[in-house]
């Protein structure tokens, strides 16, 4: 067996070697000192192995009647939804293991990918998930992949098909990740399938269950299959090639949204390396679509890889090339001027979604879909060669027009008001967190502060006032996942200096670690983990795990202080930036600046989807983690 994978198995599967108390022999490489340390750190759960530190050694473990401690697996009090969430939160790896396995994935990509996919296929076999299903739409990307999936789902649902949508992360509730026909699944369905999967996986894997992200992926696949969903749309978690969602050998169609720099510790430091990881979702003979905004370094990789695996690639057209019927036939059509999701950047995502939906429709055998594609234009499209062009699908189907208009996606260019609790306050939320997405978010914010109006509520009427010097502008920002806040903040400060946007009367950096222990653990783990590792362990995670990944932080007492330092350095302290103990307190500060509703306030919340989710939770007055 390959030593790298054996080391990986030792780290995550120590209890399996003790099963039935039989002796075993293992071979480890020169980096086995890490395994020694890992065992010592976890001596409450594992018997210590007497590894040596020579370059290569063979060790036989002693026979003993000791078994793994019972705390290796969560013991639920009941089979409720709340206990399902509690159990789910234990399926996360400690930081030491995450860092080690992240390095293995980066340094040994081919072997790691084979191992991860084989492991995922085994999990699916245990849960009787049919991987030969072909009704899958699979989408990767750096920016806009979630929005693309949401628009695609909306279009297909408007045509009358049942849909299953799996996305990540969630904003408030883990149920958001799994949606049927546009609605997140109920607590009853969540708990039913969670415990069903739990029992089946424990039977085959004892305490070695899939980690947080993988478990939810498996749950989603099981639900969509057993509920007989006609179309499944899967958003990649991180990358593509090694992602848990990449387990289907023959999806119906795949897509890659705009690419940029994110998760470099896993995917690589160049755009070409990142693009190659994303291209890993391409399959032989399966159409692949991407957007025209890809930079040359990225698109060249996508083209080369599509030719290599014989996955026909098509670059989607600009959305303004499509027309929609105005009721007078093909000779009386209109351009698409706007869609349900705000921000001009969503138009590119919409064009990608249109192509994915059209391809999915074309490949169906249902009678009503065949009747849809009965025109000579539609018949010209061949998904085997993916000769996609606008003329084949113009004017667009009515379902596509409705799907574009009716799509909603929380936390992305979202305008929120709650006059009863926050009078005269407008909240603008966008989960942008990369350098590229910060520029897109900024363009959206410019359109708001320069052309829109602010809502003013009185005791009797609601009117609108044009933006003026009396409007207070507030920024609530934080950065997670070890990302450099300076990169994100730079275009914002430059726009202020260039007088393209108003100065922020106050910028607030809240601590986004929720005070409740269950929320706190969730936020820390999601920030440092996502789906980086494969198998879970219940070793406790340090409270400061998420903030100790950047050496620069050591100069500041907290991560929030560090972000303030970055902000002050960029702005030369020309406008105030402060920290807040919590998201709740940052909202209260904003409310106080409005003089409790007597002044108009516009609040921009950005930098992290976790921050956006926390703010939405406060604004919606949902105090419990549900």
From Swiss-Prot:
It comes from the Eukaryota. Pathway: Cofactor biosynthesis; tetrahydrofolylpolyglutamate biosynthesis. GO terms for cellular component: cytoplasm; cytosol; mitochondrion. Its EC number is 6.3.2.17. GO terms for biological process: one-carbon metabolic process; tetrahydrofolylpolyglutamate biosynthetic process. InterPro entries: Folylpolyglutamate_synth, Folylpolyglutamate_synth_CS, Mur-like_cat_sf, Mur_ligase_C_dom_sf. ATP binds at residues 144-147, 412, 430. It catalyses: (6S)-5,6,7,8-tetrahydrofolyl-(gamma-L-Glu)(n) + L-glutamate + ATP = (6S)-5,6,7,8-tetrahydrofolyl-(gamma-L-Glu)(n+1) + ADP + phosphate + H(+). Coiled coil: none annotated. One of its GO terms (molecular function) is metal ion binding. The lineage of its organism: Eukaryota, Amoebozoa, Evosea, Eumycetozoa, Dictyostelia. This is Putative folylpolyglutamate synthase. PROSITE patterns: FOLYLPOLYGLU_SYNT_1. Conversion of folates to polyglutamate derivatives. Mg(2+) 2 binds at residue 263. Belongs to the folylpolyglutamate synthase family. Keywords: ATP-binding, Ligase, Magnesium, Metal-binding, Nucleotide-binding, One-carbon metabolism. Mg(2+) 1 binds at residues 168, 235.
């Amino acid at each position: 067996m390959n030593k790298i994978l054996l080391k990986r198995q030792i780290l995550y599967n120590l209890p399996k070697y003790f099963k039935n108390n039989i002796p075993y022999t293992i071979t480890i490489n020169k980096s086995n000192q890490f395994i020694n340390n890992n065992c010592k750190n976890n001596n409450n759960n594992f018997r210590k192995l007497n590894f040596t530190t020579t370059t290569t050694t063979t060790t036989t473990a002693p026979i003993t009647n000791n078994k793994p401690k019972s705390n290796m697996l969560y013991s639920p009090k009941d089979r409720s939804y709340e206990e399902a969430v509690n159990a789910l939160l234990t399926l996360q790896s400690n930081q030491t293991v995450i860092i080690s396995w992240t390095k293995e994935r980066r340094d040994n990509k081919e072997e790691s990918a084979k191992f991860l996919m084989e492991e995922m296929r085994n999990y699916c076999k245990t849960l009787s998930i049919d991987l030969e299903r072909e009704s899958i739409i699979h989408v990767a990307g750096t920016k806009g992949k979630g929005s693309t999936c949401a628009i695609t789902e909306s279009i297909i649902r408007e045509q009358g098909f049942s849909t299953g949508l799996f996305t990540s992360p969630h904003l408030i509730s883990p149920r958001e990740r799994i949606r049927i026909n546009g609605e997140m699944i109920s607590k009853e369905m969540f708990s039913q399938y969670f415990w069903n999967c739990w029992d089946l996986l424990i039977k085959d894997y004892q305490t070695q269950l899939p980690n947080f992200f993988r478990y939810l992926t498996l749950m989603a696949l099981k639900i969509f299959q057993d509920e007989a969903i006609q179309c499944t749309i899967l958003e990649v978690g991180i990358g593509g090639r090694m992602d848990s969602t990449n387990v289907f050998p023959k999806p119906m169609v795949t897509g890659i949204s705009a690419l940029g720099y994110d998760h470099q510790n896993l995917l690589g430091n160049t755009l070409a390396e990142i693009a190659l990881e994303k291209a890993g979702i391409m399959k032989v003979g399966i159409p692949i679509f991407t957007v025209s905004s890809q930079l040359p370094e990225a698109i060249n990789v996508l083209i080369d890889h599509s030719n290599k695996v014989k996955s026909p690639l098509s670059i989607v057209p600009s959305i303004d090339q499509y027309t929609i019927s105005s009721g007078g036939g093909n000779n009386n059509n209109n351009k698409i001027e706007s869609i349900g999701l705000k921000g001009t950047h969503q138009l590119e995502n919409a064009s990608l979604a249109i192509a994915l939906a059209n391809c999915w429709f074309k490949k169906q055998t249902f009678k009503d879909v065949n009747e849809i594609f009965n025109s000579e234009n539609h018949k010209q499209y061949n998904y085997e060669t993916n000769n996609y062009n606008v003329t084949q699908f113009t004017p667009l189907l009515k379902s596509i027009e409705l799907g574009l208009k009716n799509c909603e996606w929380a936390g992305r260019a979202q305008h929120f008001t709650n006059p009863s609790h926050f009078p005269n306050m407008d909240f603008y939320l966008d989960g942008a967190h990369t350098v590229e997405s910060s520029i897109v978010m900024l363009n959206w914010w410019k359109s708001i502060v320069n052309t829109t109006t602010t809502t003013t509520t009185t005791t009797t009427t609601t009117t609108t006032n044009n933006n003026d010097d009396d409007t207070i502008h507030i920024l609530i920002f934080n950065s997670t996942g070890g990302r450099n806040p300076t990169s994100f903040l730079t275009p914002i400060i430059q726009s202020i200096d260039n007088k393209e946007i108003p100065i922020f009367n106050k910028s607030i950096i809240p601590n986004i670690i929720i005070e409740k222990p269950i929320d706190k653990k969730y936020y820390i783990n999601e920030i440092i983990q996502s789906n980086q590792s494969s198998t879970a362990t219940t070793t406790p995670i340090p409270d400061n795990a998420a903030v100790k990944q950047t050496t620069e932080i050591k100069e500041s007492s907290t991560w929030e202080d560090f972000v303030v330092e970055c902000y002050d350095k960029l702005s030369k302290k020309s406008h105030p930036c402060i920290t807040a103990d919590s998201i709740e307190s940052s909202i209260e500060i904003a409310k106080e600046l409005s003089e409790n509703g007597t002044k108009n306030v516009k609040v921009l919340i950005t930098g992290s989807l976790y921050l956006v989710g926390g703010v939405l939770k406060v604004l919606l007055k949902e105090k419990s983690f549900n």
